[in-house]
């Protein structure tokens, strides 16, 4: 069956009113061939549409539809993309998927590198598998912003790091995007002694030359698990080397701020934690454009928590039951600080923070999002947890109550004997959770896009 075949029709939608039926295949909108979700969303935006459908017997029919500008037609297809996701053509020396243990669910080993997922879901792509036709389509459809894994603009070094002889050509694609005003948010996974130092200076300089099309740059330290046998030998950052990268990026950012009014580049929070330095203040991160890469995440969390706490009356907090928070090693001191602030306002607040050492991936992995259910159970069983356990929601797979190791929240609750509440990366929600106020269940927070993509991704 064609992936543009209609799987369901929203009964309250323009498509239903026009008489589109399940099983028909969408072929054209206003004369434009529909290949995937980008074509569908772009060409169905207008208020007046001429939709061509192919019926199961091979015959075609055309419908004229009137709707609100930007209103969705109301069609669901076999997959979210209306096509197969494009897999990565690289063999990056730092690829995290290559460092995962065996025996995990198959979908976790799929490496996507798809421009459509970059635009729709915020995924990062390397641009190495884009054909000239696809590059032109991004320009023609104004697909923007896109998130680009750059790593280095040195063409030879990029080919070496991505283990793809054509990887350097992607810099030319970026320059073409910049000339056509396609906005790009860029990521640099920094590997000690490889693409930092002078190579990082060149990368920042070259990307600044594409400003304002290059809208932001994040520099994040490479993650190294214990599963690297047979892989490229990588080292990790220590206090001194992490500090050197911070100085380098902050120096560039200060010069760019003076010249163009924006810092453009930021180190992730993890670099500051590795270097043992205080995180920059809220205003340093400007619009927080790189939160998904951990840039300014803890600063924003702290500021949101402060504001929420200011609005909270002590009597609202008085009924909070004793609790504990499980998180990654790196974030634990910051959460302890937030609990202390809550306790200063209301002396009855009783909470503990437990930093979970990552035995599943290796102790060098200290972020909360990679903590597994098995490690939670092993390290918290028999500990004083109070009456409830709070965990960051990013420990769980999107839309599920399941950790990366397939241990469920129900398993953890049963083994530890306390209810588990997943809290989003949001200071207001964290404050409510600490104070014992009800927060919105995960299932109700899911957007339609997350649901559709997750259902698709399960079938990869």
Task: Describe the role of every protein-language-model region.
Residues 1-10:
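PDZ/PDZ-like groove recognition
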Residues 5, 275-460:
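Radical SAM enzyme core and accessory elements
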Residues 14-19, 41-42:
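Short, surface-exposed secondary-structure edge patches
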Residues 15, 23-26, 51, 95:
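Terminal peptide-recognition signature
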Residues 17-35:
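Conserved PDZ fold ligand-binding element
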Residues 41-77:
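PDZ-domain C-terminal substructure recognizer with occasional recognition of PDZ-binding tails
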Residues 60, 67-213, 222-252:
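Conserved Radical SAM active-site core
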Residues 158, 193-194, 214-240, 260-283, ...:
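Flexible glycine/acidic-rich beta-alpha junction loops that bind and position SAM and/or redox cofactors
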């Amino acid at each position: 069956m064609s992936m543009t075949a209609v799987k369901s029709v929203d009964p309250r939608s323009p498509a239903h009113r026009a008489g589109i039926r399940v099983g028909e295949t969408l072929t054209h909108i206003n004369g434009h061939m529909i290949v995937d979700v980008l074509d569908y969303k772009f060409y169905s935006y207008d208020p007046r549409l001429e939709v061509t459908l192919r019926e199961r017997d091979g015959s075609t029919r055309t419908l004229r539809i009137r709707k609100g500008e930007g209103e969705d037609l109301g069609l669901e297809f076999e997959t979210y993309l209306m096509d197969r996701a494009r897999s990565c053509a690289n063999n990056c020396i730092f690829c995290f998927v290559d460092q995962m243990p065996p025996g995990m669910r198959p979908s976790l080993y799929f490496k996507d590198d798809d421009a459509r997922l970059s635009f729709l879901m915020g995924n990062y792509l390397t641009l190495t598998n884009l054909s000239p036709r696809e590059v032109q389509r991004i320009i023609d459809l104004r697909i923007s912003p896109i998130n680009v894994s750059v790593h280095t603009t040195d063409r030879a070094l990029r080919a070496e790091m991505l283990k793809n002889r054509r990887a350097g050509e992607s810099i030319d694609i970026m320059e073409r995007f910049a000339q056509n005003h396609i906005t790009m948010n860029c990521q640099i996974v920094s590997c000690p002694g490889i693409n930092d130092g002078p190579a990082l200076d060149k990368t920042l300089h070259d990307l600044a030359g594409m400003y304002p099309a290059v809208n932001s740059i994040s520099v994040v330290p490479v993650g190294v698990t214990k599963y690297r046998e047979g892989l490229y030998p990588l080292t990790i950052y220590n206090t001194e080397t992490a500090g050197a990268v911070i100085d380098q990026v902050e120096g560039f950012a200060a010069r760019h701020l003076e010249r163009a009014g924006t810092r453009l580049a930021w180190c992730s929070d993890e670099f500051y934690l590795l270097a043992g330095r205080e995180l920059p203040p809220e205003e340093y991160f400007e619009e927080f454009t790189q939160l998904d890469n951990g840039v300014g995440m803890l600063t924003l969390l702290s500021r949101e928590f402060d504001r929420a706490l200011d609005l909270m009356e002590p009597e609202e907090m008085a009924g909070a039951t004793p609790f504990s928070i499980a998180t990654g090693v790196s974030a634990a001191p910051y959460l302890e600080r937030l609990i202390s602030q809550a306790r200063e306002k209301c002396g009855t607040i009783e909470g503990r923070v437990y930093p979970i050492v990552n035995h599943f991936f290796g102790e060098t992995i200290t972020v909360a999002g990679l903590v597994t259910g098995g490690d939670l159970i092993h390290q918290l069983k028999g500990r004083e947890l109070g009456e409830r356990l709070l965990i960051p929601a990013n420990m769980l797979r999107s839309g599920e109550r399941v950790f990366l190791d397939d241990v469920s929240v129900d398993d953890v609750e049963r083994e530890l004997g306390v209810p588990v509440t997943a809290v989003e990366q949001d200071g207001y929600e964290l404050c409510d959770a600490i104070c014992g106020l009800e927060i919105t269940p995960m299932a109700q927070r899911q957007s339609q896009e997350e649901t559709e993509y997750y259902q698709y991704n399960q079938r990869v």
